């Protein structure tokens, strides 16, 4: 059986407590820092652009000039160049992760041990 709500005892929307998980109080500053550093976003955008431009550019630059119209070799070169960009991104990400670990100090500074 359903229970009856007593509307006179309930708080209205304006009377509810705003401190439970919502916005900070008026005198506090809110943290508007991005969750991911800007340098990481810029590296990701640069490698994304490189992943698009370098393989396609290498294909069209070499299909007629180097490989004399043989699109198989030019396509293989484009695939190799895409892998070069991907490996470059992996190296940059690993170097950044190692520098973050050296700056952080001990293993208990935010990241779990693996």
From Swiss-Prot:
What membrane topology does the UniProt entry give? Multi-pass membrane protein
Provide one Gene Ontology cellular component.
endoplasmic reticulum membrane
Q: Where is this chain's protein located in or outside the cell?
A: Endoplasmic reticulum membrane; Endoplasmic reticulum-Golgi intermediate compartment membrane; Cytoplasmic vesicle, COPII-coated vesicle membrane
Q: Tell me which positions the record assigns to the signal sequence.
A: none
- The reply on keyword Protease is no
One of the protein's GO biological processes: vacuolar proton-transporting V-type ATPase complex assembly
Q: Which UniProt keywords apply?
A: Cytoplasmic vesicle, Endoplasmic reticulum, Membrane, Transmembrane, Transmembrane helix
| Transmembrane portions of the chain | 40-60, 74-94
**Which ranges belong to the motif Prevents secretion from ER?**
111-114
Role: Required for the assembly of the V0 complex of the vacuolar ATPase (V-ATPase) in the endoplasmic reticulum.
Q: Which PANTHER family match?
A: VACUOLAR ATPASE ASSEMBLY INTEGRAL MEMBRANE PROTEIN VMA21
The UniProt similarity line reads:
Belongs to the VMA21 family.
Protein name as annotated: Vacuolar ATPase assembly integral membrane protein VMA21
């Amino acid at each position: 059986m359903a229970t009856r709500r007593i509307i006179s005892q309930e708080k209205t929307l304006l009377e509810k407590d705003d401190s439970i998980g919502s916005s900070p109080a008026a005198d506090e500053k809110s943290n508007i820092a991005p969750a991911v550093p800007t340098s990481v976003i810029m590296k990701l955008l640069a490698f994304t652009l490189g992943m698009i431009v370098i393989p396609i550019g290498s294909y069209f630059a070499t299909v007629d000039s180097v490989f004399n119209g043989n699109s198989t070799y030019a396509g293989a070169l484009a695939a190799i160049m895409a892998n070069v960009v991907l490996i470059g991104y992996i190296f940059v990400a690993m170097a950044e992760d190692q520098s973050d670990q050296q700056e952080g100090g001990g293993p208990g500074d935010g990241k779990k041990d693996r």
